[in-house]
């Protein structure tokens, strides 16, 4: 099990407001449809914001899991979770 800590500040141009989301641990979900899982998920940018860095933190990018790929609308990815499908794993979150 991989543990990590990540803090990201997101600005929403539609509401001109900022929300601060922090995720700690493995398989922890915080915020609206934010998915965080430890290890093996990789990077990629999709939806509004997708962060990987090998930690597999994906914010507002849709359902994604350790099975690989990013299901964000702008980056369909190439794994079983691509295209908005949830793989049913621990990373699928909300």
UniProtKB/Swiss-Prot annotation:
Disulfide bonds: none annotated. InterPro entries: HssA/B-like_chaperone (IPR050533), HssA/B-related (IPR008455). One of its GO terms (biological process) is sorocarp development. It comes from the Eukaryota. Residues 1-25 are annotated as: Disordered. Pfam families: Coiled. Belongs to the hssA/B family. This is HssA/B-like protein 51. It comes from Dictyostelium discoideum (Social amoeba). The gene is hssl51.
């Amino acid at each position: 099990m991989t543990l990590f800590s990540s803090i990201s500040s997101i600005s929403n141009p539609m509401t001109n407001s900022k929300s601060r989301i922090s995720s700690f641990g493995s398989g922890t979900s915080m915020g609206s449809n934010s998915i965080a899982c430890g290890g093996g998920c990789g990077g990629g940018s999709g939806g509004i914001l997708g962060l990987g860095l090998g930690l597999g933190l994906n914010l507002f990018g849709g359902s994604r899991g350790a099975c690989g790929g990013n299901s964000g609308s702008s980056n369909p990815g190439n794994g079983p979770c691509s295209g908005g499908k949830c793989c049913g794993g621990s990373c699928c979150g909300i």
